[in-house]
Curated annotation (Swiss-Prot):
Sequence ranges of Basic and acidic residues compositional bias: 125-136
Region annotation Disordered: where it falls in the sequence: 116-136
Protein origin, superkingdom: Bacteria
S-diacylglycerol cysteine lipid attachment residues: C19
Entry keyword annotation includes Disulfide bond: no
Membrane protein topology class: Lipid-anchor
The name this protein goes by in its record: Zinc-binding lipoprotein AdcA
Assigned keywords, A-Z: Cell membrane, Competence, Ion transport, Lipoprotein, Membrane, Palmitate, Signal, Transport, Zinc, Zinc transport
PROSITE patterns: PROKAR_LIPOPROTEIN
Region (His-rich loop) residue spans: 120-136
MF terms (GO), sorted A to Z: zinc ion binding
Leader peptide range in chain numbering: 1-18
UniProt keyword Signal present: yes
């Protein structure tokens, strides 16, 4: 009996050793991913070269997730850790500080992709109570097929760089999957290009990139949860809003309860449908063979319930106030004198980043968001605006140093007043005027700052005008406004800041 027990113990030990050495035995990479889209895209690229594990399963809200000690240990034991973006997995930056970078390779799936500003999302959804949740920047790029392709490409390139011996396999797998995503993109483009109604109403404000890339407009509403009926007061507001805007469908992230669907139908005359944000797949979905592409196809079918019907543009419940000081709307009495210390610091021109293509994503967003100009037209407009040969400006409380063509020129300045200018669009701006006390200041004799502020405050960036003739001559310059940001920011960081404001 003792011999049998010893044999069993030995076999168990061998089994445990074999399990712990599985990576070495099968030669596969051990990759840990955060939530479903990241898992799916990574798995498609890695194929048989890796054991790809999903950290955040169905029933757990990715926005709210905090890794357990066991989950952290799992990541620390991986070859590669893949996440989407710190604006989605907000816990990742702290985790990265603890990782052994030599042992665990990290991939941020969004790479250098710029994100749109975030905002307050749905109230009462995801069990968030009354406040909803907030992203500084909107991370939901995977819900646009054309951007999903970019995520897959970045995962492919990152894995290939980290494991060059497997590059050929990664590229082959990615190409096959990207072909499917391109078909999905084509289906969305063709299915939505002739939309009769371009606005859709959703309880989960996750579809902004999808809307932007396919010519639609997402209108998010608050105070609705798929499994709870709204209060009588909220229902009355919704009823008025739905009827005023002739809304046919409200989209939820999961099937609304029958009670809620009946209430909305009876009281507001609106139907409900599902737009799945694909943050997870349920066990039932997985067993049914659902995946990213099949769910996105269902999302398209659901969207067409709205876009195939004629209807007026749907306005948000709460209109955004665009007449702000930053946009050029203010009272004269609010304009106050400022000192050079508001601009103190070391600044870099943004013009080189326009030239090297860093800002191309910014111009693409502007074209899609406004519809006023194409991406190429925006780039031409900003090329004229940003153009300058002054690469750096270093400012103290009373001096400015201009770095031009490798030469440094430094002068002392005094404040000489302010000027309110009215623009063609009807909005206004304030220029704060400075004059060099040095007789040899030349083209830097007269300087004007415009930073979208009208009273003393530390500038985050500024547009500058300078010349050697007079302040009055500079007032006439409206097309060239060299722009400067702190010199410790990368071009990528500046581009993201531009989208945030």
């Amino acid at each position: 009996m003792k011999k049998i027990s010893l044999l069993l113990a030995s076999l168990c030990a061998l089994f445990l050793v074999a399990c712990s050495n599985q990576k070495q035995a099968d030669g596969k990479l051990n990759i840990v991913t955060t939530f479903y889209p990241v898992y799916e895209f990574t798995k498609q690229v890695a194929g048989d070269t890796a054991n790809v594990e999903l950290l955040i399963g169905a029933g757990t809200e990715p926005h709210e997730y905090e890794p357990s000690a066991k989950a952290v240990a799992k990541i620390q034991d991986a070859d590669t850790f893949v996440y989407e973006n710190e604006n989605m997995e907000t816990w990742v930056p702290k985790l990265l500080d603890t990782l052994d970078k030599k042992k665990v390779k990290t991939i941020k799936a969004t790479g250098d992709m710029l994100l749109l500003p975030g905002g307050e999302e749905e109230e009462g959804d995801h069990d968030h109570g009354e406040e909803g949740h907030h992203h500084e920047f909107d991370p939901h790029v995977w819900l646009s097929p054309v951007r999903a392709i970019k995520l897959v490409e970045h995962i492919r390139d990152s894995l290939s760089a980290d494991y060059p011996d497997k590059k050929e396999t990664f590229e082959k797998n990615a190409a096959a999957y990207i072909e499917k995503l391109q078909s999905l993109d084509k289906a969305y483009a063709e299915g939505l290009s002739q939309a009769k109604q371009k606005s859709f109403v959703t309880q989960h404000a996750a579809f902004n990139y999808l809307a932007l890339d396919y010519g639609l407009k997402q209108v998010a509403i608050s105070g609705l949860s798929p499994d709870a009926e709204p209060s009588a007061a909220r229902l009355a507001e919704l009823t008025e809003y739905v009827k005023k805007n002739k809304i046919a469908y409200i989209y939820f992230e999961e099937n609304a309860s029958q009670a809620l669907a009946n209430t909305l139908s009876k009281e507001a005359g609106v139907k409900t449908d599902v737009l799945n944000p694909l943050e997870s797949l349920t066990e039932e979905d997985t067993k049914a063979g659902e995946n990213y592409i099949s769910v996105m196809e269902k999302n398209l079918k659901a969207l067409k319930q709205t876009t195939d019907q004629e209807g007026p543009a749907i306005e948000p419940e709460k209109a955004e106030d665009t007449k702000t000081v930053q946009n050029g709307y203010f009272e004269d009495a609010a304009v106050k004198d400022r000192t050079l210390s508001d601009y103190a610091g070391n600044w870099q021109s943004v013009y080189p980043f326009l030239e090297d293509g860093t800002f191309d994503q910014v111009f693409d967003y502007k074209a899609k968001l406004t519809g006023k100009m194409t991406q190429a037209e925006y780039k031409a407009y900003y090329t004229k605006g940003y153009q300058t040969d002054v690469t750096k400006i270093n400012i103290t409380d009373n001096t400015m140093e201009f770095v031009q063509g490798g030469q440094s020129k430094k002068y002392t300045y005094k404040y000489v007043g302010k000027k309110i200018l009215t623009y063609k669009k009807g909005n206004r701006g304030v220029r704060f005027l400075f004059e060099a006390t040095d007789a040899d200041a030349g083209q830097f004799k007269y300087v004007q700052f415009s930073d979208h502020n009208i009273a003393p405050v530390k500038a985050e960036h500024f547009h500058i005008f300078f010349g050697g003739t007079s302040q009055e001559t500079l007032f006439e310059e409206m097309d060239n406004w060299p722009t400067y940001y702190p010199d410790n920011l990368s071009g990528q960081e500046i581009a993201q800041e531009m989208l945030a404001h």
